[in-house]
């Protein structure tokens, strides 16, 4: 039986393919959705012709699935788009987050043009010169402006807990949502592999806790000991349980495979992971 959610695949697993070639592969395999990571090598949000690229992408997505169209979520985890020397910097918890804020605004604009289900983003690793309270204050100060920007364009945001970042667990994400007033435009992304590493209640507990706000899901395998995205069967994830839990909580969004370090096997990995 077809699940209520849409199975997708992340373009960050196709770093050696042109974007439209990657979409063709995913369409041939039979995916219902695409998790589009902005930045190198596929869609530079700051490029002079980015608008033309987005228009072409929208048309390509509409042709997928036999013309019924593929769903899309926008991911913003590109490593060196904003700073060529420091991965992911600046983030929302840095002292100066001007570039990050503008990047997320561009992500919202592109998501609006694509009718994307959401824009997913992370908090960031706390810099050495900041205390946790500083980081939380920066998030509370900055996220409302992003929420307003997204809301004006009909776009939903989803904060992703990441191992080692200030917002690391679903409980952290729930605290953040509460701190900014539970705006309807702000939800949560859950990466099921991350749950093995940092969630006290495991994957199922995290998904159920996030359920009222769950806007985006990333699927991958992972060891319990550290943050390493792996293909299914190479870690400790109970994938049937994950899919059953998503169905049980009534999740209807995108659940996309996230294998950012497997571009070397891009044509093979989606086929192996398809219809997990």
Residue ranges and their predicted role:
Residues 47-54, 93-98, 129-136, 166, ...:
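Flexible, glycine- and charge-enriched loops at secondary-structure boundaries
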Residues 20-21, 66, 81-187:
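Active-site acidic/histidine proton-transfer and metal-coordination neighborhood
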Residues 13-15, 38-42, 78-80, 123-127, ...:
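Active-site-proximal loop/turn and secondary-structure-junction residues that shape catalytic pockets
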Residues 10, 45, 95, 161-164, ...:
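Conserved short-loop catalytic and cofactor-binding motifs
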Residues 1-8, 15-30, 59, 66, ...:
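Histidine-acidic metal/acid-base catalytic patches
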Residues 42-47, 82-92, 127-132, 196-198, ...:
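A short acidic, helix-capping loop that chelates divalent metal ions and anchors anionic groups
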Residues 1-112, 116, 144, 212:
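N-terminal pre-domain/capping segments
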Residues 35, 73-74, 120, 158, ...:
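Conserved beta-strand positions in the central sheet of alpha/beta enzyme cores
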